[in-house]
């Protein structure tokens, strides 16, 4: 194995000098010999003169010039297969749950080619989530890519947890959860919630249904940049075995941000808003690998932080292009106390097509959006002139739209500990029946308060009797 010496350290970026004849390839993993814990560098650039520029997969504190580095001759490789289930791993695939080594028989490189065009599957089957607003206006596809867009504190992680609860627990397949640059507390809560739900079995880890890979907020940018690829590699292995896998990534924005932090240190000129010039390429490399093949499927749910609630920011805007369904969370809806704060006018899905969901579902969803859009237009008139100046038909639209807004809310299982209301899973049939009746005016006599935080339309009728 070729050995080199560290010649320069700038934060997360380290330059290493090797003999001219033994320069490592780009993406090779290098081991630092003089380190108490395992410290790996990943080659990013060859600068000439035998010097390579690397990203540190860990903290560079305590490193010094002259320290010996050994080339492994291969990219970072992580354990895959059933041994990873029920375990928490870091970017290098090392266990961080203090329950011993992973002990997997097989390791895969985290840098892999996306499946070729011939291998990809183009079947469309709907995935029911039990969340009314999602199933109605932005239905998910099995094997699709779903983005949860929202600013700080509007409920991305809670929605993600509810989807894990509703899909992963109902769905008998396996899940991989990649925590990319999020709060350690959330990762910890998730682990214990999964134990309570029986998805993680501590005694017999191989009976678990989820593998967890964490690179949290407090970790250096190298870890946050590569941890999404580590989680994806594990999901790809399950898919290639012929399984249907769920991949949850929280949060894709932090992956971009880690790239931005490293990019300037690597000497690249920043592009718009200070992002790395390779933003679209980095996003494409990750997203193109998240795909379904003829062997199995990967359905991914990705939370996307929206800086300053601006959806035109380069990072969320680049992510949009890769998704099949976008669930947009709106701060104004959250401010009204209507949760989940999903905006039915801004959220989209490629599956909302009469050929996929059926004409009936399509008409109901478009009818709901039409009513809400008309109400949005009338709000200015109401603010200036008041309700009395509206025509009878417009008054009816406003009344129905307000009921629809409230009926789109529902209690979540994962929020039960905060609200005290038991969570509800609403089947698609019930969702469609409720909204069809609302649009047809069957429930015009029920007060709008009755529709707040209920499951099916029958719950709203029961609530009306108590008012």
Swiss-Prot record:
Keyword check for Repeat: no
GO cellular component: plasma membrane; proton-transporting ATP synthase complex
EC number: 7.1.2.2
PROSITE patterns for this protein: ATPASE_ALPHA_BETA
Enzyme class: translocase
Family: Belongs to the ATPase alpha/beta chains family.
Bilayer disposition of the protein: Peripheral membrane protein
GO molecular function: ATP binding; ATP hydrolysis activity; proton-transporting ATP synthase activity, rotational mechanism
Localization (cell): Cell inner membrane
Matches recorded under HAMAP family: ATP_synth_beta_bact
Keywords: ATP synthesis, ATP-binding, Cell inner membrane, Cell membrane, CF(1), Hydrogen ion transport, Ion transport, Membrane, Nucleotide-binding, Translocase, Transport
Residues given in the record as ATP binding sites: 150-157
Protein name per its UniProtKB record: ATP synthase subunit beta
Gene3D superfamilies in UniProt: 2.40.10.170, Bovine Mitochondrial F1-atpase, Atp Synthase Beta Chain, Chain D, domain 3, P-loop containing nucleotide triphosphate hydrolases
Domain of life of the source: Bacteria
SUPFAM superfamilies to which the protein is assigned, alphabetical: C-terminal domain of alpha and beta subunits of F1 ATP synthase, N-terminal domain of alpha and beta subunits of F1 ATP synthase, P-loop containing nucleoside triphosphate hydrolases
Assembly behavior: F-type ATPases have 2 components, CF(1) - the catalytic core - and CF(0) - the membrane proton channel. CF(1) has five subunits: alpha(3), beta(3), gamma(1), delta(1), epsilon(1). CF(0) has three main subunits: a(1), b(2) and c(9-12). The alpha and beta chains form an alternating ring which encloses part of the gamma chain. CF(1) is attached to CF(0) by a central stalk formed by the gamma and epsilon chains, while a peripheral stalk is formed by the delta and b chains.
Catalytic function, reaction form: ATP + H2O + 4 H(+)(in) = ADP + phosphate + 5 H(+)(out)
Organism taxonomic ancestry: Bacteria, Pseudomonadati, Pseudomonadota, Gammaproteobacteria, Vibrionales
Chief place where the protein resides: membrane
Function: Produces ATP from ADP in the presence of a proton gradient across the membrane. The catalytic sites are hosted primarily by the beta subunits.
